[in-house]
Amino acid sequence: MTKKWTALLLAAVLAVGLSACDTSRAEAPGSNLESGVSAIEDAMTKRNETESSSFPAGSDLRIGTSADTVATPDDFPAAYNYGTGKIEDYSRTAMLQKMPEPVDNATVLNTSADPNHIQALYLWEEGNVPAKTQFTAAMTGYFDNWDFRPYVTAIPVRTGVQPKGAVVLMAGGAYQFRGNYTDSLPTAAALRELGFQTFIVDYRLSPYTQEEGALDVARAVRFVRQNADAYGIDPDDIAVMGFSAGGIQAGEFLMHYDEDVNGTALDESYVPDALDAVPAHASAAGMIYSFYGRLSVGNMDPDWLAEGDLPPTFYVYGTEDPFYRQFRQQYDVIRNMGISTGRIVLNGWPHGFGPDGGWVNDYAAWLESVFANKEES
């Protein structure tokens, strides 16, 4: 079986039912997890009707390679072993694997940042998590249990490496699961080897809403900014990036929940704490087979996009992705709005390739340039 068709059958689950699992159905039964996975596995075997042969000449379109894909680093604990990071080695088991949770109620407020070790911290204090969705013990079958608390996992650069900035990552999964071991974790490892401090957000999924997840992203960005000195970075050198639904989640944060917006925007009972005084500001965005908008639908309205005062944005997608045309169209809209952009298009690649394809180094170089010239952006 070729790499492309292996990807179509397996890696596609990262998109998880972008058309089958709309987040507007917050009250849908938890069985949507399995039905969504199955639906997307079936849907992703269908070829996309692309016009890749007539793609404009330039350096954006490429064949794609696994030459630079990073396998699990030798200093990662066993619990963070994701394998080779290559699309051909993906499996449903890996895609549904969960990241280790924090221990001893360690939170971003009660625990000091550790720039020398992988560290998992809850994003919110117990009993003070802003929410508008009632998720109860009687609601079963979801990826997360009803008492799930969002958390961030910091993956710092190797000792002795001068950090170039920070990247906050969100996995895909159409709000039905988080594919950390197939996209965000191996990508974080690759960016870490290139000198970036990385932070993976385990944000809230269904039955929670996109808006609630955006607050989790904002909280993680605040944590990174507050601890910029500890991580050896400029507090303004922070990017957010996401894969599929994770990119949509990053976009929701940038459009409506960044800067000074806190949990009270959704939940009047939320009590702001010291971390809320830190602006949730990101200087760049990465849309990896994703777009600004909602599940399945990228927003192409320049007036709406302008409301978000969006930062420079980098797009990565394949020509065999069912959402190829939407990615391409939004990239053109964003660029025509005067927003600084970057792009890699992998010819013949599907949805859900994670860090594979040879795009991470280009993204890292683009990010360095954005950080160096952010005053002009």
Regions found by a protein language model. Name each.
Residues Y315-Y317:
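Short beta-strand/loop motif that positions the catalytic acidic residue
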